[in-house]
Amino acid sequence: FSFDKLAKKLDLMSNVEDFVKCQYEFAELTGITPTWSAFYDDGMATDATGFYTGVYDRIHERYADASSIDWQDEVFGGYAMTQSHNVNISTGTEKTQVMLSYNYNGQDGLLANHSANKSAFRAKINSELYKGIRLDVNAMFNNKSVDGGGSYSGMKYVLRQPISGGTYFTRDQMLTEQTYVDFRGAESSYTASNPLIQNEASTSNKRSRMFSVNAGLEFDFLKHFTYRIAGSYRWNSSKSTSFSDERSTGYLMDPVNTGMTGSIGNSESYSYQITNTLNYNQTFAKKHKVNLLLGHEVSYSEDESNSISVKQMPYPNHGIDDISLGNVEEKKSGHGHSGIVSAFLRANYTFDERYLLTATLRADGSSKFAKGHQW
C-alpha cells in the first residue's frame, strides 16, 4: 500500500485584493466594468458619484483581509491510495512444471471519480508427456477498469475559476454551487465553471478484458527430426460509457437542444494463429552441420465495434442505463476481418563452426489483397 499526493502546485495568484484589482483593470480595458461591479463591487452603478475615484479604496476595504480559495488544493489536495497484491504458486515434478500467478493493482485518483483497477491471472505449464513428446501452455486473462472524468477538462477549470466570489457569491456558494451560468450569463468571456461540480457532473468508465493462450506440442522422431504444432488465440473486449448530467457545462450552455448527454461504445476482437514446422538437424563428418526447416502457418483476425451518442436525456437518475430516453445524436458500427496463409522453407549449412550459408524460400497469401493478387 502507498499514498500519493500532489507533489507541486502551480504558482498562481492567491491575494484576493490583487486579484480583484486585476479583474477591474481587465474590465476597464475590455469595456465590461458594469459586469465587474456586479460581481465584485456590490453592483454599484458605474455612473454613480465616486465610482472611479474611490474604486481602489473600496477594493482595499473589502478584500485586504479576505481569504482566497485555493482551487488546486480543493480539487487535488487529498491523498490517493495505491495498492498492489501478488500471489504466485509453483509446483510440479521432474517432467512437469506448473506456475500460477494472480496480480491486482488498484489506484485511486487525486481527483474524485478517477481511478484505475487491473487484475491479471496467468498460468504456465511445461511438461514432457512421454519420451520425445513435450507440451507447453501459457495462458493469461486481464481485466481492467478505468474511471475518468468524461468531458471534464481538468486544469482548465481549476485555473480559470475565480479565487473569490466577490460580493456576488459567498465562499460556500463558490465551493458547492455551479457558478457557470451566472458568470457566463453576465459576460461571455467569463467561462469559469466550478471544477468540483463539473467533475461530479461528467463521468466516464472504460472496462476492458483480454484473454490469450499459446500452446505447442513437439515430437522427436527418426533421431534427427522434430515436428512442432503451435497455436495461439487472443480475445479482446471493451466497453466505454460517459454521462453528463444537468450540472455539466454542456447542459447549462444549451439545456433544450443538448441537455444531458451520454454515450456507449463496445468493441470486440479475436485472432488466432496455427503454425506447423518440421525441423531436421544432422552433422556429417563432425564439420558439416545441416539444418532444414519446413513450415506452414495460418492466421486470422476479426473485429467489430458499435457506439451510440445520445442527447436530451430527461432523467439524471437513470444515467446511461436507459439510452432509449434520449435522442440519438450519432451512431457508428464497424466490422473487419483478414487472414494470411504462409509456407516457408529455410536451409542452414555450417562448416567447421566458422562458415555459415543460409537460404530461405517463403510464400504468403493475404485476404487484404485484391482477388488474383493475393499471393
Enumerate the language-model features and the residues they cover.
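Surface-exposed loop/interface segments of Gram-negative outer-membrane beta-barrel transport/assembly proteins
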Residues: 1-68, 109-116, 120-212, 228-230, ...
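Outer-membrane beta-barrel initiation region
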Residues: 75-80, 89-93
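Conserved interaction-surface patches within small, structured recognition/assembly domains
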Residues: 82, 86, 106-107, 343, ...
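Outer-membrane beta-barrel channels and translocator barrels
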Residues: 82, 93-94, 130-132, 220-222, ...
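Outer-membrane beta-barrel architecture
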Residues: 86-90, 101, 124, 214-216, ...
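Transmembrane beta-strand segments that form the barrel wall of outer-membrane beta-barrel proteins
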Residues: 102-108, 357-369
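Extended, hydrophobic alpha-helical segments in both membrane/secreted and soluble proteins
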Residues: 121-123, 229, 274-276, 341-347, ...
